[in-house]
Amino acid sequence: MGRGPKKHLKRLAAPSHWMLXKLSGTYAPRPSAGPHXLRESLPLXVFLRNRLXYALCGREVKAIMMQQHVQVVGKVRTDTTYPAGFMDVITLEATNEHFRLAYDVKGKFAVHRISAEEAVYKLGKVKKVQLGKKGVPYVVTHDGRTIRYPDPLIRANDTVKIDLATGKIXSFIKFDTGRLVMVTGGRNLGRVGVIVHREKLEGGFDLVHIKDALENTFVTRLSNVFVIGTEAGKPWVSLPKGKGIKLSISEERDRRXAQQGL
């Protein structure tokens, strides 16, 4: 009987959104313990080697990171298996590049480059609001942050804008009808739309009805909804290619044909 934490991860058991080839080895890099769960994160080794192709192997990734060229959310990271997750900002000082991890409509983490002005903050979904010792209020975000003395109007499911230099809340968005949201789980992962209606179910999961830019309506759980803007067309963060609009197979075919001039 095995005891203790698991230290290995078979490549076939790795999350599909890492997009690792089945025949390129027996094992995959297992994410370290960190702010994001294993199946909701992307190890820095996979990001640098497989997505950016800045390294050919894990040894080269280690050499890059030990030179302290890689920052995640404003802090230097030297662990090649550090788990970066949704809304995290990855900075490469050597090339002066900034990336934000966000989902595309295929459910994969997109390589989304952002400007230096946008790289100074991130968004966090409020998971709970509580009182600590001596009555000190605090909020806990989706990435494990605990922020004390928040605005009294902040509630669960709201989104806070976090300044990476200070770690403090700069502003927040209330969860309400008409807000621009991105889906972070389920079959609609990566889609972006506006909240139309929140359906409360007794003894079950609350459902949220969302309408995208093409007037298509879909439903997902409340736990999968992440507010990213106050209204349609005005997100607080730039969106990856596709802008969160999911097309059918025939619509994608027609778009490719139009781009090729056929």
Swiss-Prot record:
Keyword set, alphabetical order: Ribonucleoprotein, Ribosomal protein, RNA-binding, rRNA-binding
Family annotation (InterPro entries): KOW, Rib_uL2_dom2, Ribosomal_eS4, Ribosomal_eS4_C, Ribosomal_eS4_central_region, Ribosomal_eS4_central_sf, Ribosomal_eS4_KOW, Ribosomal_eS4_N
Pfam families assigned to the protein according to its UniProt record, in alphabetical order: 40S_S4_C, KOW, Ribosomal_S4e, RS4NT
Record PROSITE patterns: RIBOSOMAL_S4E (PS00528)
Gene3D superfamilies according to UniProt: 2.30.30.30, 2.40.50.740, RNA-binding S4 domain (3.10.290.10)
GO MF term set: rRNA binding; structural constituent of ribosome
CDD domains attached to this UniProt entry: KOW_RPS4 (cd06087)
Annotated ranges, domain S4 RNA-binding: 42-105
A Gene Ontology term for the protein's cellular component: cytosolic small ribosomal subunit
GO biological process, alphabetically ordered: translation
Family: Belongs to the eukaryotic ribosomal protein eS4 family.
Protein name according to UniProt: Small ribosomal subunit protein eS4
